[in-house]
Amino acid sequence: MTNPTEHTLPSNSILESREGEFGCTVMDLRKLMELRSSDAIDQINVHYGGVMNLCSRLKTNPVEGLSGNPADLEKRKQVFGQNLIPPKKPKTFLELVWEALQDVTLIILEIAAIISLVLSFYRPPGGENEQCGLAVTSPEDEGEAEAGWIEGAAILFSVIIVVLVTAFNDWSKEKQFRGLQNRIEKEQKFSVIRNGHIIQLPVAEIVVGDIAQIKYGDLLPADGILIQGNDLKIDESSLTGESDHVKKSLERDPMLLSGTHVMEGSGRMVVTAVGINSQTGIIFTLLGASEGEEEEKKKKGKKQGVPENRNKAKTQDGVALEIQPLNSQEGIDSEEKEKKAAKLPKKEKSVLQGKLTRLAVQIGKAGLIMSAITVLILILYFVIDNFVIQRRPWLAECTPIYVQYFVKFFIIGVTVLVVAVPEGLPLAVTISLAYSVKKMMKDNNLVRHLDACETMGNATAICSDKTGTLTMNRMSVVQAYIGDTRYHQIPSPDDLVPKVLDLIVNGISINSAYTSKILPPEKEGGLPRQVGNKTECALLGFVSDLKQDYHAVRSEVPEEKLYKVYTFNSVRKSMSTVIEKPGGGYRMYSKGASEIILRKCNRILDKKGEAVPFKNKDRDEMVRTVIEPMACEGLRTLCIAYRDFNDGEPPWDNESEILTELTCIAVVGIEDPVRPEVPEAIAKCKRAGITVRMVTGDNINTARAIATKCGIVTPGDDFLCLEGKEFNRLIRNEKGEVEQEKLDKIWPKLRVLARSSPTDKHTLVKGIIDSTVGDQRQVVAVTGDGTNDGPALKKADVGFAMGIAGTDVAKEASDIILTDDNFTSIVKAVMWGRNVYDSISKFLQFQLTVNVVAVIVAFTGACITQDSPLKAVQMLWVNLIMDTFASLALATEPPTDSLLKRRPYGRNKPLISRTMMKNILGHAVYQLTVIFFLVFAGEKFFDIDSGRRAPLHSPPSQHYTIIFNTFVLMQLFNEINSRKIHGERNVFSGIFRNLIFCSVVLGTFISQIIIVEFGGKPFSCTKLTLSQWFWCLFIGIGELLWGQVISTIPTQSLKFLKEAGHGTTKEEITKDAEGLDEIDHAEMELRRGQILWFRGLNRIQTQIKVVKAFHSSLHESIQKPKNQNSIHNFMTHPEFTIDEEGPRTPLLDEQEEEIFEKVSKPGTKTSSLDGEVTPQTNKNNNTVDCCQVQIVASHSDSPLHSLETSV
């Protein structure tokens, strides 16, 4: 992979020479795509002779698309480039090694080891050795003297091993992250027409000249020019900063830009620029160049002694984000907030990360104090013994020997600190998450943000969509009401009047997205494939069941002949299509939610096909006798209607007038069966202490019936099922503002929210998260598929997007993508999340036992024997076992069903429970008893020479080798004990299902044998006899037996035990900190590319002078930028949005007639001024969506405004 800065565009001469091949060059198309509105239309018409002629120049057919000839596609890639923006160059292994070497404790060890190494070669002058006291208390032979350098060299070697292991782990982690990113990118496909067929193509395979089909919810992968569009609206805020949606049409503005979102409508475009030649790619290229320039400046600044800019906030991975104020006043406010934030403790988005950070700091402080006391005691004892008790003078020639002792003491202290500081915790978290993410892919969970995996383990509530998640999303019409008759099964075509049959067929075939269709089954005897919107597919299937052909209708009325299309959105809750009648005038077909469309009908077709009046009492009767019975059977009801316009040109922009006086053709009942595995999955959630709520756009009766089938509600339960309108009435005050107190009375009992908009979903999620009801804050997971589900997905602790039915916008806002759109996969995510939490707790139980024992042994040994029984290199080896191998073994335990039989841990539950504390202290007591017995009585028990008070460079003793070997073997068997943290007795349960664990334990044991038998002086070891090995092994196995003893002690009786590793409590959060956004450093680490994007988009205001096309007016505006976010919102990542503090008033779900009046008035914007609410479309008719987008207007003095006006 290459850095964007290394990619330069081809020179103009080369580009111009290629003009003959396609009739236009890359530069021509780039210049064309920089134009907007009338300028763009003039250029297309004057220079290219219209869009169709441009297609001819690009050798593509606007209807059939490219032929798909490999040679032609390859030529296009060579001439116009590939649709790839090169990612940031990954760090090399050597760079990661250098980063690992920056660890403070390792640096201290390196310095101490080098000093030890240098001084070991010093020999005091002969004859005066006796006066140096303790340094030469016993004579050394030549071999012992020569061995002095070995300890220093061994420490250096151990540090190198630790650094290499750390660098390798970082490298593999980054590789895995990039693999995950590549997987996500490969998942992204786009619809293009090739050789007359619509195919799904990976975004990277799109070339200039492709005819792309665009629809609601798409993220445009390349620049293009509109060929044909239906009510198309684009969100261009990612490039222009304008939050208002831009209406696209051939007459107004046909320019479509990569990185923008389709918020409404559909259409076709010809691709004109891809990759680094697209508008997004150009900005990326500029950012790469500006980054290179800045780095050069930084280097020069350092050489010349220029201080770096202080207005930079360092992120975790060292990327500096340049902060610029939005305007003068906001700049002051943001500066004050920044200062406050700098003083306050940061809250972690990930519950686990927050707890681990706090615990690591506590342990680190304790370790630092213990190591300092250890060094102090060793030095004081040495000084007092030599210079006070024995009254020896300080001789100059003895100074190097004394220094050697001080260095040795210092090394002991540092090794105590190294063992005490739990560096293995981040590694254990990374390994556990990476392992879980990899396995979750097999369970149809594509994790985009690593912390979401762990957060799911704490989930207490799931707000789920109905269609496709709880149901099969395999819709079919099973009942109908046509001509005053209710059919409980599909009627025969002979039963219907020809006129009515034709109206049904035309009303469905024409008034459905042409991308929705029924294809033959993939396997013989299988069900026909439904492509596109599943609701529309159900209606098309209804046409086929009536023995009619919708293809024939669409051939007669191709998409180009559609006069006007009102696409489905959350305000209309319907879709309407207008066509010209052969004899003059227009006909409009409408379809939508039955209660919405029927309210706009004033006539209905009777048995003879004649239109008869349809009054309010008739509508109420139909609702009572037709719609409600269908809904109670779990069917969704849709109404199909039409209207003829015979006189003149109607006011098409006045929807309130157009969408009235309809004639009802039919009402159909659509069945979407509940997935067979869902009831069991919801039962598991209930057992696991997770409340499942259904949030749907369906009728309240339909929603209640489906919820009952799923097991979300059971008859007789005291739970609420509300419609969005009633929900808003209950939670809002007279001003329309949400009151948390009112919401707190509703949400605990709410199980079904029907006829809801995405605003309602966001309000519910926010209300549950912000609620203070109960001891713990709720952890909420949300599913979403529509563009307008973005705010709710972002607000939730974990957002699940649908991989099949979900839009690109929803996927971008999500944390996890369900590749099978199945609720059962969410339950598996819960299981994996809890498993991560348990894996970290297992590792903690193991590591803290080692910490406690190693620190106490080193400290006590130093105080009593002036030496640590465990040498520096041995402790580094133990630390390596702890940090790497144990984390690998314990963090990769597979999950079990028992995880779902426990309640959620909660945000404030400690990482170290009382049971774990009992295990840690219990095993520490056993190990300390054994080690102290061996230290002070081991030589007598084994009948060997004592290793205590040995001279500085004396050879390794069997005594201390036995202590070291016993210590390691006890840790090894305690690793098996640590597999269980909830008091289970059978620690071997499922051990052979985890091959990694078995391999690590076996590998560590073999390594220990090699170290003891062949490690020699570097490891301060000597060979042991067979009987000594058996004793060591017996003591190690005693850990397993002792574990059973500890398990018999009831935890409740040990009330003196305290818990540790709590989350941040409410009392600990200051008032100033309450408003701060939660920051997830793991996410920032994962998505360095997006951080680069954000940084560059802000910095481009000062770097953009390199672009020659900008006029001089731009240079003035750059000096005083007033708009921070002019073009920053490319992928709308949550960590980059700036949440406004003011109260938000979402769109109320009022009477449809009132909404239509507001929306359809000319000049009315869909976003309110303080504006958080922009009504949008939804992919499926069953949900009702409304998007909240942040308004960041392009200021008249901003560089981007200059760019737009001057180009």
Curated annotation (Swiss-Prot):
Ranges for the region named Disordered are 294-317, 1159-1181
* Coarse class of the protein's main subcellular location: membrane
Instruction: Give the UniProt subcellular location, in the record's own words.
Output: Cell membrane; Cell projection, Cilium, Flagellum membrane
NCBIfam families the record matches: ATPase-IIB_Ca (TIGR01517), ATPase_P-type (TIGR01494)
Name this protein carries in UniProt? Plasma membrane calcium-transporting ATPase 4
Question: Quick one: a GO biological-process term for this protein?
Answer: nitric oxide-cGMP-mediated signaling
Q: Which residues carry this modification: Phosphothreonine?
A: 1102
Q: Where are the transmembrane segments?
A: 101-121, 148-168, 369-389, 409-429, 844-864, 872-892, 919-939, 958-977, 995-1015, 1029-1049
Cellular component GO terms held in the UniProt record: ciliary basal body; intracellular membrane-bounded organelle; membrane raft; mitochondrion; plasma membrane; sperm flagellum; T-tubule; Z disc
**Broad class of enzyme this protein falls into:** translocase
Matching entries from SUPFAM superfamilies are given as: Calcium ATPase, transduction domain A, Calcium ATPase, transmembrane domain M, HAD-like, Metal cation-transporting ATPase, ATP-binding domain N
Kindly give the CDD domains that the UniProt entry links to this protein. Answer: P-type_ATPase_Ca_PMCA-like (cd02081)
* Biological role stated in the UniProt entry: Calcium/calmodulin-regulated and magnesium-dependent enzyme that catalyzes the hydrolysis of ATP coupled with the transport of calcium out of the cell. By regulating sperm cells calcium homeostasis, may play a role in sperm motility.
**Binding residues annotated for Mg(2+), in chain numbering:** 785, 789
**Record's compositionally biased regions (Polar residues):** 1163-1181
* EC number(s) reported in the record: 7.2.2.10
Active-site residue numbers: 465 (4-aspartylphosphate intermediate)
Q: Which PROSITE patterns match?
A: ATPASE_E1_E2
